A protein has these predicted regions:
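A short SAM/SAH-binding and catalytic strip from SAM-dependent methyltransferases
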Residues: 133-148
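Conserved beta-strand signature within the Rossmann-like core of class I S-adenosyl-L-methionine
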Residues: 163-167
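A short acidic, Gly/Pro-enriched loop at the edge of an enzyme's catalytic core
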Residues: 124-135
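A short glycine-rich, Lys/Arg-flanked "PGG" loop and its adjoining helix->strand segment in the class I
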Residues: 150-162
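Class I SAM-dependent methyltransferase SAM/SAH-binding core
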Residues: 83-125
Length: 167
């Protein structure tokens, strides 16, 4: 019925306190070799399901706010394009678009959906200089660790034209 030993509760009240003491953290699950261990593994294994859940989401209001800041026909980088939903929207509105994603499976499906090549590339591999009037990184940069943000921010800034827009 009841356990013979009392349950142990975490002595830390906040997440911040817990992460400040990683040596005392309790591991609830173990990553087995058959389970997804990285974000890219997850997207590669679940690409079709991800696309099904995101392709029809209407981002028109946000996309238009971004486009309103750009010159007509500007070059846009869809940085972590996922399904290609936003890439296609920008193309249909007369913009030139380069699209990248780290997931090979998403790249293949997004390329098929958008009709343009989608480059399989990690954020840290962006190596462009003053090419883009806008970089669209919608729901993408959240996949980076804190330690990766400086390098990727530098690469984004370098890839943008002067006065370029990042979303």
């Amino acid at each position: 019925m009841y356990p013979s030993t009392p349950m142990q509760y975490n002595k830390y009240k906040t997440i911040l306190e817990q992460v400040s003491h990683p040596q005392e953290a309790t591991v609830n699950t173990i990553n087995e070799p058959t389970k997804s261990t990285t974000t890219l593994d997850y997207y590669n294994k679940n690409a079709k399901k991800f696309i099904t859940g995101t392709i029809s989401v209407d981002f028109g209001i946000v996309q238009n706010r971004f486009l309103d800041k750009l010159h007509p026909g500007a070059e846009i980088l869809d940085y972590g394009c996922g399904s290609g939903r936003d890439t296609k929207y920008f193309l249909e509105h007369g913009y030139r678009v380069d699209a990248i994603d780290g997931s090979a499976e998403l790249c293949a499906l997004a390329s098929e959906y958008t009709g343009i090549p989608v480059k399989c590339q990690l954020f840290q591999e962006l190596d462009a200089s003053e090419v883009y009037g806008g970089i669209w990184a919608c729901s993408s940069l959240l996949h980076l660790s804190y330690g990766e943000l400086d390098e990727v921010s530098y690469r984004i800034e370098k890839a943008l034209k002067p006065q370029g827009i990042l979303y």
